[in-house]
């Protein structure tokens, strides 16, 4: 880069749920800063995220996160190329804080504003591991979503399978609560699963159905019924075995559906993304399944970027910007935002 050439720097915002995050990303794949202010302790006593509490924390943290992100990256507003923000899906109040902050910065400093689908951000976290090669497939597993997303080319998405009820991450939190685990329960359940055995034969709903959709409500109900029955008769169940049996059922369904999707949609990469992508059991199973696949390479989002963060938003924003995806100051939060087949510019 010549001394007069301006760097491509995106200031990215993420506030869709219970993490306030601001990052500075260079060229879509280099993290100069990624500030994350978590709210987990504030929500633990409620057993889950309380939208009003989340919004209040975002208001308190957003300005500090901006200042810290710029300071850590050692850049100023004049150095920025654009501003990016998650505008959905998520909690409407939480989203509005990030959207408002991003629009304010963009307007005040005359910078382009890039709207980002939160779920696309999760997928593009893989860009910090290696470039995404197309066609690609993403198994997107989080607290609110469980989806198989086919990507024939850059900036194109097609959901070919999704949960019909509970998301996998939501099921983890619910069974964790039954076992007395604080929110979020995923890591503890995963740790216990590695210490136990698959002794409870929980159902694997839709595993053999002729589609790529998922269902975890039946598994959750079977788990709750098993523990409730044990309580009624005074039986103590091994929590590690319960966790192992539950996790095995979840992983079996996710892996089976993914393998069948890959058979119908040949791709160069399978990207594992979302909060549940940090699950050791799932990462190990997919790695084993794809070890013998000569054409599809598994790319796992970095553990530190599996949860909500602005770095992943900046990664996809860079791609969206190259495709002319821009918004103006009329951009609003869209809590029910879905994937478009093509990520068209927001008007």
From Swiss-Prot:
Cofactor entry: Fe(2+)
InterPro entries: ATPase_NBD, Gcp-like_dom, KAE1/TsaD, Peptidase_M22_CS, TsaD
Record-listed E.C. numbers: 2.3.1.234
Binding site for substrate: 140-144, 173, 186, 190, 279
GO biological process: tRNA threonylcarbamoyladenosine modification
Enzyme class: transferase
CDD domains: ASKHA_NBD_TsaD_bac
GO molecular function (one): iron ion binding
Location of the protein in the cell: Cytoplasm
Alphabetical UniProt keywords: Acyltransferase, Cytoplasm, Iron, Metal-binding, Transferase, tRNA processing
Gene Ontology cellular component terms for the protein in this record: cytoplasm
PROSITE patterns xrefs: GLYCOPROTEASE
Binding residue positions for Fe cation: 118, 122, 308
Keyword S-adenosyl-L-methionine listed: no
Keyword field contains Nucleotidyltransferase: no
Cofactor binding, per record: Binds 1 Fe(2+) ion per subunit.
PANTHER family xrefs: TRNA N6-ADENOSINE THREONYLCARBAMOYLTRANSFERASE, TRNA N6-ADENOSINE THREONYLCARBAMOYLTRANSFERASE, MITOCHONDRIAL
Described function: Required for the formation of a threonylcarbamoyl group on adenosine at position 37 (t(6)A37) in tRNAs that read codons beginning with adenine. Is involved in the transfer of the threonylcarbamoyl moiety of threonylcarbamoyl-AMP (TC-AMP) to the N6 group of A37, together with TsaE and TsaB. TsaD likely plays a direct catalytic role in this reaction.
Similarity section: Belongs to the KAE1 / TsaD family.
NCBIfam families xrefs: gcp_kae1 (TIGR00329), T6A_TsaD_YgjD (TIGR03723)
HAMAP family, per database record: TsaD
The protein's name: tRNA N6-adenosine threonylcarbamoyltransferase
Organism expressing this protein natively: Levilactobacillus brevis (strain ATCC 367 / BCRC 12310 / CIP 105137 / JCM 1170 / LMG 11437 / NCIMB 947 / NCTC 947)
Upper classification of the organism: Bacteria, Bacillati, Bacillota, Bacilli, Lactobacillales
Gene responsible for this protein: tsaD
